[in-house]
């Protein structure tokens, strides 16, 4: 019996650790519906809405960093009437905003996934983040060890881009929540 309890203890610790991690990741967290004009989605309640700084930004949500990270993650929902270039052109532009440890563009991952009623291109990359300047807006600061997750939702009238950037550890922890958000993406008529 004592050998059996010794064997079980690591499993109990592992299960307890997994349960704690699920709470940190928001797996059991209630969600709220975010309306971004012609697009809606569900996001964890802890993702706080912040004022947008431009009409092309339909929504912005801030997510507090995990312990050890110094700044929050920010999800920005952009809407561009008529689109904003091809998926490939945007991948190239975003890849150019990041550098790996050798100063080269990092690998960028892209795949097509399903939203609630639309196809979505999910994009991910990481490294030293140096965002491009947007005319008329305050520049974003450069960030070491950053990660970006993007959902691209093209429609006949508008191209939607959900771009989330933050510290690597925080963003890695947020991947399941971001993927759940993508699954809930719903295109509505504008």
Question: Which residue ranges define each predicted feature?
Answer:
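Solvent-exposed coil/turn segments that connect beta secondary-structure elements
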Residues: 37, 66, 80-82, 126-130, ...
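Secretory pathway targeting signatures of secreted, lumenal, and periplasmic proteins
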Residues: 33, 37, 42-103
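Surface-exposed amphipathic alpha-helical segments
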Residues: 47, 156-190
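Signature of long, low-cysteine stretches enriched in small and polar/charged residues
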Residues: 45, 55-58, 91-153
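Beta-strand-rich interaction surfaces with strong enrichment in secreted/lumenal proteins
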Residues: 31, 49, 110-112
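Bacterial N-terminal signal peptides that target proteins for export
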Residues: 2-16
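Solvent-exposed, acidic/flexible segments
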Residues: 54, 68-70, 83-87, 142-145, ...
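Bacterial Sec-dependent signal peptides at the C-terminal "C-region" and cleavage site
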Residues: 17, 23-31
């Amino acid at each position: 019996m004592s050998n059996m309890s010794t064997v079980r203890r690591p499993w109990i610790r592992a299960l307890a650790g997994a349960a704690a991690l699920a709470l940190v990741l928001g797996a059991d967290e209630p969600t709220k519906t975010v309306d971004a004009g012609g697009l809606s989605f569900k996001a964890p309640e802890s993702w706080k809405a912040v004022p947008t700084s431009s009409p092309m930004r339909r929504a912005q949500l801030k997510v507090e960093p995990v312990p050890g990270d110094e700044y929050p993650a920010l999800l920005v929902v952009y809407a561009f009437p008529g689109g904003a270039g091809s998926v490939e052109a945007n991948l190239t532009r975003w890849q150019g905003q990041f550098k790996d440890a050798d100063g080269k563009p990092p690998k960028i991952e892209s795949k097509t996934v399903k939203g609630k009623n639309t196809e979505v291109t999910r994009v991910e990359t990481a490294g030293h983040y140096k965002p491009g300047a947007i005319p008329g807006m305050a520049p974003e600061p450069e960030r070491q060890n950053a990660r970006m997750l993007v959902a691209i939702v093209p429609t006949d009238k508008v191209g939607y881009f959900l771009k989330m950037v933050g510290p690597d550890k925080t963003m890695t922890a947020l991947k399941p929540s971001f993927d759940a958000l993508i699954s809930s993406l719903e295109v509505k008529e504008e």
